[in-house]
């Protein structure tokens, strides 16, 4: 019986060793551009430095997926002011290419919704309360050509998260990454990874 079990395992390992895979190129080839620009993601209905932190995580994932030079252009307001326009339309795309010398640029936003405080009773007898805050966080980004203003790629990702505490200012939640919030770091890193999936090569079984 034992010998039969060993033989079965050996056959399974042998079969696994025969499986072949092929590398599938990324759905979006960013290396077609000499240089790309990145506008700081705009934070919607939230205060703090969440926009800057989310932009940096997105930048890290893009450059990890494909080795392409990325120029950080600044906030949406600063970029639009620099080119004398008020929105990211075709004229803005052409102007950004001329002013910053990039062939395409990323622009998008990050939003936090469904912010709900939670209070958990640690133990029935201890009467110790722990306050947490649950929320949904979404990130949407598009890649725009500066040659003709066309949208070359767009995607969005949503994730639920929970942090220890969230401040409120003027009725809007305040997220501060400077507070070394590990939970928020993990949420931002995961959503940035999901959002940049099209830039990564994948492995497919033959």
Residue ranges and their predicted role:
Residues 1-18:
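Sec-dependent bacterial lipoprotein signal peptides
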Residues 29-31, 101, 130-134:
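Short coil/turn motifs at beta-sheet boundaries
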Residues 15-33:
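Bacterial Sec signal peptide processing site at the extreme N-terminus
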Residues 10-13, 28, 97:
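Structural motif
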Residues 130-138, 144-193:
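Short secondary-structure boundary motifs at beta->alpha junctions and helix caps
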Residues 204-206:
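Short, solvent-exposed mixed-charge patches
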Residues 33-35, 40-114, 140-146, 150-154, ...:
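N-terminal segment of the mature soluble domain
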Residues 109, 114-134, 163:
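Mixed-charge, low-complexity intrinsically disordered segments
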């Amino acid at each position: 019986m034992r010998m039969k079990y060993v033989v079965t395992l050996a056959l399974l390992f042998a079969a696994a060793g025969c499986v072949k895979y092929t590398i599938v190129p990324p759905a979006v080839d960013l290396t077609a551009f000499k240089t790309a620009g990145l506008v700081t993601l705009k934070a919607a209905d939230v205060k703090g430095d969440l926009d800057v932190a989310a932009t940096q995580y997105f930048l890290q994932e893009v450059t990890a997926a494909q080795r392409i030079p990325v120029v950080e252009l600044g906030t949406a307001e600063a970029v639009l002011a620099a080119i004398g326009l008020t929105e990211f339309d075709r004229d803005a795309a052409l102007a950004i290419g001329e002013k910053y010398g990039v062939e395409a640029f990323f622009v998008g936003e990050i939003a936090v919704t469904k912010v709900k405080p939670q209070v958990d009773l640690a133990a029935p007898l201890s009467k110790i309360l722990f306050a947490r805050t649950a929320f949904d966080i979404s990130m949407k980004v598009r890649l725009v050509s500066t040659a003709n203003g066309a949208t070359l790629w767009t995607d969005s990702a949503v994730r639920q998260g929970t942090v220890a505490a969230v401040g409120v200012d003027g009725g809007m939640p305040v997220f501060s990454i400077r507070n070394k919030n590990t939970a928020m770091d993990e949420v931002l890193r995961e959503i940035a990874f999901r959002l940049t999936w099209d830039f990564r090569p994948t492995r497919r079984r033959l």
